[in-house]
């Protein structure tokens, strides 16, 4: 599922991400825009680590989810990677909360590249929240 921006903003807010660990809703929207284009089915393979990033938050199979094929995987969120690509993003959000609790928002490269030190207010502009 490719979320519409405001629909995703409302969903993330409902699931408790607004200001979770001090990260604003606008920052989460920016992160998911640049990681996946708001697409729950997004996947990207990383040849160097033989791992794959899954779902709207592009959660990595080496550290956070189990896809059954990544060498030396840790499965820190105790979730199958396929569950991170469901249209219902509850499990993906739970894992994102776990990641930001352990490593902070800088765990996401796209956030560092595209959102840090940027005005991200436009990501929630015009949304009825």
UniProtKB/Swiss-Prot annotation:
It catalyses: Hydrolysis of (1->4)-beta-linkages between N-acetylmuramic acid and N-acetyl-D-glucosamine residues in a peptidoglycan and between N-acetyl-D-glucosamine residues in chitodextrins. Residues 1-129 form the C-type lysozyme domain. Lysozymes have primarily a bacteriolytic function; those in tissues and body fluids are associated with the monocyte-macrophage system and enhance the activity of immunoagents. Its EC number is 3.2.1.17. Lysozyme C is capable of both hydrolysis and transglycosylation; it also shows a slight esterase activity. It acts rapidly on both peptide-substituted and unsubstituted peptidoglycan, and slowly on chitin oligosaccharides. Coiled coil: none annotated. GO terms for molecular function: lysozyme activity. Monomer. Belongs to the glycosyl hydrolase 22 family. The active site is at 35, 53. Disulfide bonds join 6-127, 30-115, 65-81, 77-95. InterPro entries: Glyco_hydro_22 (IPR001916), Glyco_hydro_22_CS (IPR019799), Glyco_hydro_22_lys (IPR000974), Lysozyme-like_dom_sf (IPR023346). It comes from the Eukaryota. The lineage of its organism: Eukaryota, Metazoa, Chordata, Craniata, Vertebrata. The keyword NADP does not apply. It comes from Capra hircus (Goat). Keywords: Antimicrobial, Bacteriolytic enzyme, Digestion, Disulfide bond, Glycosidase, Hydrolase. This is Lysozyme C-1. GO terms for biological process: defense response to Gram-negative bacterium; defense response to Gram-positive bacterium; digestion; killing of cells of another organism.
């Amino acid at each position: 599922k490719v979320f519409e921006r405001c629909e995703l903003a409302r969903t993330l807010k409902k699931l408790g991400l607004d200001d979770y660990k001090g990260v604003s809703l606008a920052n989460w929207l920016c992160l998911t825009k640049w990681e996946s284009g708001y697409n729950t089915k997004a996947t990207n393979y990383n040849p160097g680590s033989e791992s794959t990033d899954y779902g709207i938050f592009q959660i990595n199979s080496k550290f956070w989810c189990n896809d059954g094929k990544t060498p030396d995987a840790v499965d820190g969120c105790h979730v199958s990677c396929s569950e991170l690509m469901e249209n219902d993003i509850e499990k993906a959000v739970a894992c994102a909360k776990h990641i930001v609790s352990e490593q902070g928002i800088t765990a996401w490269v796209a956030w560092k590249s595209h959102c840090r030190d940027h005005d991200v207010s436009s990501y929630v502009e015009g949304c009825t929240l």
